[in-house]
């Protein structure tokens, strides 16, 4: 990241990353860059078997940029694209469910399937899923509670998916002391709200059970 200003420091916040229009869940970016300075940042993805960054022909980054010394500002939005195979190449990812996916839910708000359950290099269990927003609303989805084999675990995650848009997301269970082979049941909740009407309460608040 490069701050071309001579006298202002800016905060760069990654609002979203999309691969061919599909929202991808990442570690996020929130970095302050001083005037005239550059900063290298790392964006972390969870490895999964459904896709890699090489699967997409168009990676779209949406940043909100704030003056670090100003208050109560909305921030300017900057959008840029990376075309791994060239801008005019006809490469576009399409999600094609295989026999290993497990249906999660199909209601008037969204359709979702579990694509994979596995532990990462830190020993945390992850439930990967694909979700399609069936509404004309921008949805804010969060998960803040869950369990592993009935033992309570935090699953704090936040997702934002636009009207008719799809999302690759994952739920993480941290600080596990249970070997992966002994995990029989994973539970988590999804609370779904209309971004433009958060005061109106949830459109859906439901607990799901997944067997790895």
Name every feature range the model reports, one short phrase each.
Residues 1-7, 130-136:
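Asparagine-centered strand-capping/turn motif at beta-strand->loop junctions
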Residues 7-15, 55, 137-145, 183:
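Short, hydrophobic/aromatic beta-strand segments
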Residues 13-23, 143-152:
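Extended low-complexity, serine/threonine- and proline-enriched intrinsically disordered segments
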Residues 23-76, 124, 150-200:
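Short, solvent-exposed, Trp/other aromatic-anchored flexible loops in extracytoplasmic proteins
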Residues 73-94, 201-212:
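Short beta-strand elements
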Residues 89-121:
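Low-complexity, acidic Ser/Thr/Pro/Gly-rich terminal tails and inter-domain linkers that flank the onset
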Residues 122-128:
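Short, solvent-exposed loop/turn segments enriched in Ser/Thr/Gly
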